[in-house]
């Protein structure tokens, strides 16, 4: 799985856990095992706008992995579409038209891929 991707300015833990969970069995423990301490000034989400940009990068990177099962590939595409929509909504709110157009094009392409696969047009 490698280590944290140091090329990502943020969400490198998200990227790592995506890769780990894609290829290893992970189980749910219904018990609090840590105390989350968020919202402080040093938090990267305070430093970078649109944190989902880095999550989109991580999901796109995962899609390039040839070892991803068909089911997990489709689920990754669905999550990528969801994250793109979050960014599109934020971009519209902030009037980032070029950003929105680029992401909307990518989202539409992924929706077509999923639709074609559902309809057997691969």
Predicted features and spans:
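Amphipathic alpha-helices of TPR/Sel1-like and other helical repeat/solenoid scaffolds
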Residues: 56-63, 87
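Short, solvent-exposed, charged loop/turn and helix-capping segments
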Residues: 65-72
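Conserved nucleotide-sugar donor-binding catalytic segment
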Residues: 1-58
């Amino acid at each position: 799985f490698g280590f944290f991707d140091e090329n990502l300015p943020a969400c490198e833990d998200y990227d790592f856990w995506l890769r780990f969970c894609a290829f290893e069995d992970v189980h749910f423990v219904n018990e609090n095992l840590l105390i989350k301490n968020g919202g402080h000034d040093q938090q990267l989400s305070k430093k970078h706008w649109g944190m989902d940009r880095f999550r989109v990068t991580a999901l796109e990177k995962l899609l390039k992995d040839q070892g991803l099962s068909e089911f997990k590939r489709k689920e990754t595409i669905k999550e990528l579409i969801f994250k793109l929509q979050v960014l599109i909504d934020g971009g519209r709110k902030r009037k980032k038209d070029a950003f929105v157009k680029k992401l909307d094009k990518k989202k539409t392409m992924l929706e077509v891929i999923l639709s074609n696969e559902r309809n057997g047009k691969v």
